[in-house]
A protein has these predicted regions:
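Conserved active-site alpha-helix within GNAT-family acetyltransferase domains
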Residues: 97, 121-140
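Conserved acetyl-CoA pyrophosphate-binding loop and the N-cap/start of the following alpha-helix
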Residues: 90, 94-102
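Acetyl-CoA-dependent GNAT
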Residues: 6-10, 17-76, 100, 138
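Conserved GNAT acetyl-CoA-binding A-motif
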Residues: 108-118
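Conserved N-terminal entry element of GNAT/NAT acetyltransferase domains
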Residues: 1-10, 152-157
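Conserved acetyl-CoA binding element of GNAT-fold acetyltransferases
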Residues: 77-88
Length: 157
């Protein structure tokens, strides 16, 4: 039977291991700069995001990292899904769907007006899954990002 649990500070190394596995799957391993100290600060000291695990027989088989954003149009918080990942040996068993549904329940219980996330355009299995749960791609929007160096440069200009 699948269970879910909220991550605790003692899980930092496990969270980081999942982050590395996801980054490897997404072919973005060279972009990971998170460390245990950084995760402790942002996840547990500042509480900027949350992590839940999906578990089988007390073994963490996957994780999701999420946080709240805000919609000025609805006047309510939303749930932003940063990461969702299931270990390869546990895929095709419904664990990812169960983990996603648990996030939907959290969003509903907290009164969120929406859930949002991004998905790599080559990740067809994930895109197909999201479409199957009636998620819609956002048309007419482009995602922008300032990385740390750009933030620093602009802040100091």
């Amino acid at each position: 039977m699948l269970k879910f649990r909220q991550a605790e500070e003692k899980d930092i190394e496990l969270i980081l291991a999942f982050i590395y596995e996801l980054a490897e799957y997404e072919k973005m391993l060279d972009e990971v700069s998170a460390t245990p100290a950084i995760l402790k600060e942002w996840l547990f000291d500042k509480k900027a995001a949350e992590v839940i695990f999906v578990m089988e027989d007390d073994i963490e088989t996957g994780y999701a990292l999420f946080f709240h954003n805000f919609s000025t149009f609805t006047g309510k918080a939303g749930l932003y899904l940063e990461d969702i990942y299931v270990k390869p040996t546990y895929r095709k068993k419904g664990y990812g769907k169960a983990l996603f549904k648990e996030l939907v329940k959290i969003a509903y219980q907290r009164g969120c007006s929406r859930m949002e996330w991004v998905c790599l355009d080559w990740n067809k299995p994930s895109i197909d899954f999201y479409l199957s749960v009636k998620a819609k791609p956002i048309k007419d929007w482009t995602i922008f990002r300032l990385d740390h160096e750009e933030i620093k440069d602009l802040a100091n200009s």
